[in-house]
Amino acid sequence: FITIHVYKYMMNRLIGYARKLLSVLEEEGIAFEHMPSGIDSISLIIREKHCPPEKLERIVEKYKQLDADSVTVDQDQAIVMLVGRGMTKTVGVAMRATAAFSKAKINIRMINQGSSEVSIMFGVEAKDAKASVIALYNEFFN
């Protein structure tokens, strides 16, 4: 995966800014996988195979034209999902998962949990993907 991080001070107060970011992806014919966000930032996670270097360069340039304070790109990323309906009523699931990553010396680049609490997405470096799955398996199933 590729993660494009767009930073803009007080982005949350700008009407339509996220739509403009997504419109750029639409113009390039690219769907996004996840879109974690904060007050000043949106991270767009897209499949690397759908975004060759020339498309990525155009996207970054268009985002800069939208007056972003900063646009950065992380390549060679992986997404690891922890999924389960029982997570909704279970205290400490995220803590156990992050502790498992820490114990395995895996740096978490991003965390996203939807309001349904059915899944937690962890962004890690691609080189750590297999070790991440093993760490979570050992924590929750061993």
Stretches found by the model and what they are:
Residues 1-142:
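A conserved regulatory-domain signal marking ACT and ACT-like small-molecule sensing domains
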